[in-house]
């Protein structure tokens, strides 16, 4: 394990003194610059979600976790397991880089966007979520932000969990972490989740035949990890996980042809790494392999019938990252190598293709008096597009003790994926998307309130979109995004408050039309308190107006705003047994995040966990 105390001492001078007045310990994060540092030293806005948060919210999906976070806007084609997209600060879903333990999530299919409706929430032990450009650190895709899902469990022992809920929801989970001798730790986990679901199509067209069925979801997950400390400075790990998902959905139907209304996703990932953690130097070498097979088929014909579709992707990664404490800060450097291969038929590609990318990056953080400076530069060599460079820089000025002003600028890009280039809907003439972003922010600690207010602008050239008329991907030109984000957290006696407000104006800079499925405004509020050992949580989410397209008439539609309330409670019956209950969408609001696709309405869940 990293010598956290030594690293904190070396970097503590960069930590913002206003946060030091808070009684809560400063969390260490790794996602911002690829080296471990106190969260308060990071100039970009970053949010950390722990497993304790997820259990307290009683979230049954990763999307339910992420929707609570600042800047996140989720559009989903129905309920649990249905296709979804994540927008951060008004950008496309393909502009969100999703990492699993620091490694890019393998994405099968044409869109190039991470669909986290399929990723098991049972695997999530921690999330580090950073907003703003990060291509200078991670390469392609990191235009809107980075979501790093960490699966490493820090809690020893064994836990058994079972839950039931509305729409036939069931969940059974067992996990254990055991010490094998003084220097070896093993972790195992298995999870089963199922829901009968509901009919996801609210209105619109599914062809010549209605499909008034329930669209359910089934997921089975296995996870294993082995960690070993060879000495005080050297350690290694081997880790693997896989999940097998089945999703039923409503699809377009015409008489005499198969109805492709079932999705079957197989995914497996393996990685191994070696770490060196000295007093001033850290180094890590990680290699990984992932393989996903995504079928869409008619159950009457089977997934191997000629009518079925298959998206199959293999991904190979090697990462070597290094950092050294220098002066009042840190310098990091490393290299990434990635190879992605598609099998014939993937994304309607008739032949198999592969794409290779090698990236070199340099990062740095330094404090000079009341000023903190952060920078990064990266060069990517892509087999499809050649060499591409990105950079970013930030500066923070603590002009009064406890109050800081931050200014930042960064460039980023998104390369088209293999399906967008070579698939049936592809366009081999696509150019990479280019982004330039500016942000200014004030933050501080006032009367016990930790707050941050920021304004940002993001200009994206050659943004890739899909044209339903031509059935092709194309570069639609220039997109302009402007926004304001405000966050705060504070305690009033036994009550803990977390609040965020987002106002985003994202539109095509040429036509001045707003981009689809982005809320103009969002308000998110979390209230937590404890009374007689009962832990209560109240969640409020205002989802503002947004625009979409009616794909029957191809006319734009405006969807009104909605206020959603959740209530959760847990009670420890003993020191080992805890029961939990939740009401989601307490007032049973009828709303949509994708036009024509219903949401679940009011739902109840009840669960219990036993630890030993």
UniProtKB/Swiss-Prot annotation:
Entry binding sites for Ca(2+) 1: 199, 211, 213, 215, 250
Protein's UniProt name: Vitamin B12 transporter BtuB
Family: Belongs to the TonB-dependent receptor family. BtuB (TC 1.B.14.3.1) subfamily.
Gene: btuB
Protein's UniProt keywords contain Transport: yes
Top-level taxonomic group: Bacteria
Span of domain TBDR plug: 38-152
Membrane topology: Multi-pass membrane protein
Principal location class: membrane
NCBIfam families assigned: PRK10641.1, TonB-B12
A molecular-function term among this protein's GO annotations: metal ion binding
